[in-house]
Structures are given as C-alpha cells and as structure tokens.
C-alpha cells in the first residue's frame, strides 16, 4: 500500500523511557543549557560548574601528547575489551607503590571511556531492581543517576559538615537493610573536598564486613591534596573485601577530554563470579575503550607527576583553593569548610541570613544577573537548599572577582 493510501493518523508520540524517571545530572542540567543559550547570544559566562581543567589554562604534560601522537598509527583498530596490556600493567605498577594496596592482577584492571563509563557498566552488572546502594550526601550525582538507571535504589548517607564533611557512621548503619548491596566512598570527596581519615575508612570497611557489602571507591582526586593531607585507598584498609577502585587521568593529568579511566578490582573474587562475568560482558559489548587515549596511561603514570607542582606551596591549584575558601568565608551569612583535596568548594548559606527556598532558582538567577554558572547543592543530592558547589579551577584573580560578585548578588537577593 502506498503511503498516500494509508489512513491519516497523527504521528506516534515518542516518550522518554520510564527508566530515566529518576536519572538527574544537574552539573549539565537545565541551568547549564540556559548558560549555553546566553553564550550563543554573545555573553561571556564564567563557568564554575564543572571540573574541566583545560578551559582554565591547565594543559596536559607534553610527554603525554607526544606519546599519543606517536601511537596514532598503531591505534586504528580495536584493542582488547579490557584495554591495552601496557596501560593495564602501568596501572598495576601504580598501585604497587600505594602503601598497603592489595595485590592487583592485570586481568582485574578494566580501562574505560572515563570513569563515568565504568560506573555505568558496574551498576548495570551489579544491580537488580530494588537493590540498594549506600551513596554519600552530598555526592557526585552520576553515582545516584546510574544506580537508578540500573534499577537500583540510591540510599544517601549523610556526611557531617561540622566534622570536616567526614561520613556519619551512625547514619550509615541506620540505613542498611536486607536489600543493601554496596557501599560507595568518594575520597577525596566531590563536592566537599574532604579527605577521609584512616579511622573513618576503617569504620567504613568494618561496616562492609559486618553486612557483607561490596565496596566501591571513587578515588579520581587521590593526587590532588592540600595542606599535607594524606590519601588512604579504601582497598588498603580492606584487603579481605572485594573492592572496586575507580580512577583515571582526567583530573590529575588534566586530560578530561581524552576519556581515560580505569577500574581496579581487588580482594577475594570467588563469591563474585557472576558480577565479574557481568562486567566482562558489558566491557566486551562496547568492544573497547577509545584506543588512542589508552596510550596516554603508561607515560602519564610512569613520568614526572607534574600535579605536585600545582598543589604544593606556590602552586596554582593551592593558591586558587585558598582564595576561594577565604573569599567565600568573607561573605556575610556564608561559611565554607576548607577543602583538603579535589577541585571544589561547597559553601553553606546560613538560612537565618539567606532565606533560600529553591536553590535551583538561586543558581539560575545568579546566572542571569551576574553571568556566573555554579551548581546548586541539591544537584549533589544534599537534602537542604542551603549549599552550592564552586569549581576552584579559574585563575585566582578571576575567582576573587567571581566570589565578590556572588557576595554582592546575595546581599540584595530575596526569594
């Protein structure tokens, strides 16, 4: 039958899948879209919303780019699904230098198109409908989103602002049920900048032992530390537990666009053959991670660790952290715990001074008036409308101006 002879019917409406009902990622959400529209109209937007080092003048070490260029002729085909062997061996060597880190086999390392892809793969392989994952509040929201997408239920445990944003152990214990399957630890923490103490990490491991939970360790910022802070890998305090450690090149090596991440699996595996087969299946189904970026891993991990020049006294990242923290605390009604790591500050707006009922509206109004883009605290699954996240990547002078403008904005802002 020709199309002209078919009865006229309105086109079928294609709705969004119900699987996306609870999937939210505000870091690039509606306010970010509004910022893009303003940019298209010619406005200059200061983007304090995303931890993307390159636009702020942070360049990858030359040796990384040279190695990728040299490897391009050999990177035209697929690699092994887990990634090229030389990169995975370099990751094994990296963790051999981490005090107490459990033995890591090269076959237990998976490369990914950034940590984000490996989070997605892990949650899809791990979760059945209704399975619960303990996730910090505030969190990096992709963990919550991918838990929901996989059919799981994110259960947020509180981190205590009055204790340098360390996890609230009692709150975690109170939220464990017979459906709890995994405990996520983000350390150093995004968005708070907290670096967890050995005592807290041991208590988290004890909870996992007691309740037979899988440990998930997001440690992408483990080399971005300030003020003599020491990072302790979660796997190192729990060598007897199955632990999935996530890391990559995006932050410490300033190559977020290369999308080069990894997953390292340590601990006993006999009881987890089904999970590991699932991760294998999903890693194979995407064929392989992008191959050129895999060639950056060996040289990055084995070469000069230039991130140290940025975080020590006189380093740009340390200076910017200091400026952000100091200037935020100068604003009436604003307080900020000093970040010990990562690339963010998570200030609090005193509700007795700033009556914010809708932090999304606050962020949108700030964008429209001051052309500054931040992310509201509820975008990180913080329960109250009294926080926001600021990226500390801009030059110190730009940060100082932006925070001053933010303070001026707050002084007359009402909801």
Task: Please place each PLM-identified region on the residue numbering.
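Conserved core segment of the aminotransferase class I/II
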Residues: 236-315, 325-327, 410
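Conserved core of the PLP fold type I
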Residues: 75-206, 223-236, 404-405
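N-terminal small-domain helix-loop-helix segment of the aminotransferase-like
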Residues: 5-114, 121, 288, 300-303, ...
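Helix C-cap/helix->beta junction micro-motif
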Residues: 41, 150, 210-211, 241, ...
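PLP-dependent enzyme catalytic core of the Aspartate aminotransferase-like
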Residues: 2-3, 174, 355-357, 361, ...
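Generic structural signal for small/hydrophobic residues in well-ordered secondary structure
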Residues: 31, 48, 68, 91, ...
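Hydrophobic residues in well-ordered beta-strands that form the structural core
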Residues: 135, 156, 215-217, 374-376
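Conserved glycine-rich beta-strand-loop-beta hairpin in the small C-terminal domain of fold type I
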Residues: 298, 314-325, 336-350, 384
């Amino acid at each position: 039958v020709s199309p002209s002879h078919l009865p006229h019917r309105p086109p079928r409406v294609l709705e969004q899948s119900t699987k996306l009902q609870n999937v939210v990622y505000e870091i690039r959400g509606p306010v970010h879209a509004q910022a893009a529209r303003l940019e298209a109209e010619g406005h200059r937007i200061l983007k304090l919303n995303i931890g993307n080092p390159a636009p702020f003048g942070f360049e990858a070490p030359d040796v990384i780019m040279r190695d990728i260029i040299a490897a391009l002729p050999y990177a035209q085909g697929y690699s092994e699904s887990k990634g090229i062997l030389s990169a995975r061996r370099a990751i094994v060597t990296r963790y051999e230098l981490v005090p107490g880190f459990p033995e890591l086999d090269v076959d237990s390392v998976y490369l990914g198109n950034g940590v984000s892809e490996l989070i997605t793969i892990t949650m899809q392989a791990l979760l059945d409908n209704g399975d619960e994952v303990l996730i910090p509040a505030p969190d990096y929201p992709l963990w919550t989103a991918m838990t929901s997408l996989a059919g799981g239920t994110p259960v947020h445990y509180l981190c205590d602002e009055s204790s340098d944003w360390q996890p609230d152990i009692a709150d975690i214990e109170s939220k464990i049920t017979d459906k709890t399957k995994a405990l996520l630890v983000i350390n150093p923490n995004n968005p708070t900048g907290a670096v967890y103490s050995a005592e807290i990490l041991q208590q988290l491991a004890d909870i996992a032992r007691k309740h037979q939970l899988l440990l998930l360790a997001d440690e992408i910022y483990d080399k971005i530390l300030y003020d003599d802070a020491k990072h302790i890998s979660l796997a190192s305090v729990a060598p007897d537990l199955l632990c999935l450690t996530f890391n990559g090149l995006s932050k410490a090596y300033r190559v977020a666009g290369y999308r080069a991440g990894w997953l390292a699996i340590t601990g006993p595996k006999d009881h987890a053959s089904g999970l590991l087969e699932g991760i294998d299946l999903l890693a194979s189904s995407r064929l392989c991670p992008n191959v050129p970026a895999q060639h950056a891993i060996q040289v990055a991990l084995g070469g000069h660790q230039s991130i140290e020049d940025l975080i020590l006294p006189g380093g740009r990242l340390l200076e910017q952290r200091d400026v952000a923290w100091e200037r935020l605390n100068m604003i009436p009604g604003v307080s900020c715990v000093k970040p010990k790591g990562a690339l963010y500050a998570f200030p609090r707006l005193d509700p007795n001074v700033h009556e914010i009922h809708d932090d999304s509206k606050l962020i949108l109004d700030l964008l429209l008036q001051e052309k500054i883009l931040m992310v509201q605290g509820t975008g990180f699954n913080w329960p109250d409308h009294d926080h926001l996240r600021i990226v500390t990547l801009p030059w110190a002078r730009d940060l100082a101006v932006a925070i001053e403008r933010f303070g001026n904005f707050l002084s007359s802002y009402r909801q």
